[in-house]
Design a protein with these regions (language model features):
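Amphipathic alpha-helical recognition patches that constitute DNA-binding helices
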Residues: 20, 24, 179, 207, ...
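C-terminal substrate-binding subdomain of Rossmann-fold SDR/epimerase-dehydratase oxidoreductases
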Residues: 71, 210, 240-386
Length: 386
């Protein structure tokens, strides 16, 4: 049966240039596009491990519809040609782990702003549609966080719900280099918006709110550097797999809404296949029903991992650490992130489905199956003597 868009028109097969296709979100998007659509993907990245199962063997049902190009977009003259060959470019490439923002601020700013510039330019000059991945971090802190602790207004959604077309972007001072990422993302959003306004670029900007699931980041010492600090899902998974305490930064009081990657990818597919409804828009993509403090997240993950692995949890499963100890000088944090869903709901009729419990159970089952043996082996190896 021919695929139809939300307005009943049949969808023509597209060629998509996906930059950063080998990452967490890219791997899920490629999987969905191969399994459920006729679209072709030119997959650009410096790594391909997370999409290897889609590239080999050549007998796969979608062979010929996905092509990997090992390209660093910082310096590769093939970029423009690949964008020209495609109907649509999706840019996911970025440094996007908070441990880097204050320790490698230059790399962070270059990656999120400077390196994205040619992509925007080539799309604009060649009249190609662009879906660019920004972040919910562009909202920074909530207005409510500046009110007195006991102010009743803190409970009023007007002071914390984050709306694409109304909320301000509130970052800390320059010396808090945590905001280097958010600020670079904000500027590239403004540039894309301006290309749309002045030069007619067809664009959609996505602001993900803590998408999580299998293949997110890496487990230090197993499929990433031992000293590396991934995002919270992988940090907590790593501690659970090693039977270590989960570290709560500054007491784990910050709040987040987590969304299952598979729900979020449905929203991206709707954007891809409904350009008339998605062009010119900025979309929050999150799950406002899945809010927890980081401490609650740690408690839930501990309980679920115990169920999944059959191992009893530690007597004291968490430990408090200061942000300076954990991330170093210049760290700062978003206090609360509730996405307003009005625009995506109106334009694309999309809503998230999966509860936090269910998504953590699916994800931790994957983590256990994928890493438990490798961790056991690594931990039983004698430490090399100097
Ligand atoms: N996962 C989330 O919840 C989340 C939240 C907010 C924003 N985002 C944004 O979504 C995008 C994708 O995030 P992700 O979670 O998949 O991250 P990821 O780190 O898993 O994926 C990014 C990919 O981009 C590639 N890349 C980076 N620089 C490159 C370069 N110069 N040339 C070629 N490839 C390059 C990396 O190798 C990596 O595979 C990023 O822009 C990120 O800022 C993600
Ligand atoms: O995912 C998003 O929507 C955006 O937010 C993330 O930022 P953040 O949520 O702060 O990063 P996480 O590593 O997921 O941390 C969440 C919270 O857990 C805390 N944390 C993290 C790791 C840990 O071991 N312990 C711990 O308490 C952090 O301090 C933070 O308050 C990242 O910046 C991006 O991937 C993305 O743009």
């Amino acid at each position: 049966m021919a695929r139809a868009d939300l307005d009943g028109r049949s969808i023509k097969p597209l060629t998509i240039c996906m930059i950063g296709a080998g990452g967490f979100i890219g791997s899920h998007l490629c999987e969905k596009l191969m399994a459920e659509t006729p679209h072709k993907v030119l997959a650009l990245d410096v790594y391909s491990d997370k999409i290897r199962h889609l590239l080999e063997p050549e007998s796969l049902a979608w062979a010929g519809r996905i092509q990997f190009h090992r390209i660093n977009i910082k310096h590769d003259s093939r970029l423009e040609g690949l964008i020209k060959m495609a109907d649509l470019t999706i840019n996911l490439a970025a440094i996007c782990t908070p441990a880097d923002y204050n320790t490698r601020p230059l790399d962070t700013i270059y990656s999120n702003f400077i390196d994205a510039l040619p992509v925007v330019k080539y799309c604009s000059e060649n009249n190609k549609r662009l879906i660019h991945f920004s972040t919910c971090e562009v909202y920074g802190k909530t207005i409510g966080s500046f009110l007195p602790k006991d102010s009743p207004l803190r409970q009023d959604p007007a002071y914390y719900v984050l709306k694409e077309d109304a909320s301000p972007c509130i970052f800390g001072p320059i010396e808090k280099q945590r905001w280097s990422y958010a600020c670079a993302k904000q500027l590239i959003e403004r540039l894309i918006y301006a290309e749309g306004a002045e030069n007619g670029l067809e664009f959609t900007i996505v602001r993900p709110f803590n998408w999580i699931g299998p293949r997110m980041d890496f487990i230090p010492g197993i499929d990433g550097p031992s000293e590396g600090v991934p995002r919270v899902l992988a940090c907590f998974s790593n501690a659970l797999l090693r039977r270590e305490q989960l570290k709560l930064v500054d007491g784990g009081q910050s709040q987040r809404t987590f969304i299952y990657i598979k729900d979020a990818i449905e929203a991206v597919l709707l954007m891809i296949e409904n350009p008339e409804r998605a062009n010119g828009h900025i979309f929050n993509v999150g799950n406002p029903n899945n809010e927890v403090t980081v401490r609650q997240l740690a408690e839930m993950m501990t309980q679920i991992y115990s169920k999944v692995s059959g191992e009893a949890a530690l007597d004291v499963p968490t430990i408090d650490v200061s942000s300076k100890e954990f991330y170093g000088e210049g760290y700062d944090d978003s206090d609360k992130r509730i996405p307003d869903m009005t625009i995506i709901n109106r334009q694309l009729g999309w809503d998230p489905k999966t509860s936090l419990w269910d998504l953590l159970e699916a994800t931790l089952t994957y983590q256990h199956r994928t890493y438990a043996e490798a961790i056991k082996k690594a931990m039983s190896r004698p430490v090399a003597s100097s």
